[in-house]
């Protein structure tokens, strides 16, 4: 019997997430990340995009799960309060029991305001994630509006192929390059860089977790999915799961 059964946690340092979507546009208008649009919708400032916070968890999850995190990791998040430029955020993760493949994660501002809560796990057999549990509690919507022309299982018009290099501007949705992101990312790993990417366990530079949503959206227009608009989007929940990771720069 161990001396204590105290639940242990690990945390990172306070970081200042940076706003990089103030020039984001889609469907002919600016986004919630524009100061004026945010103010018009009643927000005190333009929120920093949710996946930006994911980078602060990567050092913690690499410590807990090792290289398996990069190869089969799943981060599943429910956002609680927005963060604006200048605010500090700290990421936390519970230390799971030996052999466990899932753990709790959360982030807080310096004053204790919760930013997000969720789970992180590794595969191939992922336990139920934060979003799995939340979806199980949902009731079917009686009347869809924005998504009324879409249905579960719908396929895009074409098979999409996307790649990210260090200097490539990622388009109107994400008007910056990977190198520009790396200059402002909260947790920079040498494994992300052109100079030292070959030092990663896979011998190549890997794409940061927070940039995976950028990559998947790069060709999203090709799918031809129709939604009613104009509409201004804001993430409430988000999940990213690696199947055969990591993803590499220039591939």
Please place each PLM-identified region on the residue numbering.
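Hot-dog-fold acyl-thioester-processing enzymes
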Residues: 2-72, 127-239, 245
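Hydrophobic beta-sheet segments that form the core/acyl-binding groove
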Residues: 69-119, 238-251
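Short beta-strand edge segments in extracellular beta-sheet folds
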Residues: 121-125
């Amino acid at each position: 019997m161990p001396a204590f059964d105290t639940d242990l946690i690990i945390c990172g340092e306070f970081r200042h997430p940076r706003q990089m979507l103030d020039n984001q546009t889609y469907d002919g208008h600016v986004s919630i990340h524009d100061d004026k649009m945010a103010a018009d919708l009643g927000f005190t400032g333009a929120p920093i995009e949710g996946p930006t916070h994911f980078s602060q968890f990567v050092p913690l999850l690499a410590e807990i799960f090792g290289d398996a995190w990069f190869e089969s990791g799943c981060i599943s998040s429910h956002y609680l309060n927005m963060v604006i430029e200048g605010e500090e955020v700290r990421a936390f993760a519970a230390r799971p029991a030996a052999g466990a493949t899932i753990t709790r994660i959360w982030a807080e501002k310096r004053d204790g305001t919760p930013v997000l809560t969720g789970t992180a796990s590794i595969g191939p057999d992922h336990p139920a994630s934060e979003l799995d549990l939340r979806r199980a509690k949902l009731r079917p919507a009686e009347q869809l509006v924005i998504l009324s022309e879409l249905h579960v299982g719908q396929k895009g018009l074409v098979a999409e192929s996307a790649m990210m290099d260090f200097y490539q501007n990622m388009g109107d949705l994400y008007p910056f390059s990977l190198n520009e992101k790396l200059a402002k990312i909260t947790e920079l790993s040498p494994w992300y860089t052109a100079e030292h990417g070959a030092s990663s366990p896979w011998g190549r530079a890997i794409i940061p977790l927070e940039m995976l949503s950028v990559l998947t959206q790069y060709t999203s227009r090709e799918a031809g999915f129709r939604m009613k608009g104009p509409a201004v989007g804001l993430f409430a929940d988000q999940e990213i799961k690696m199947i055969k990771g990591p993803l590499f720069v220039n591939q």
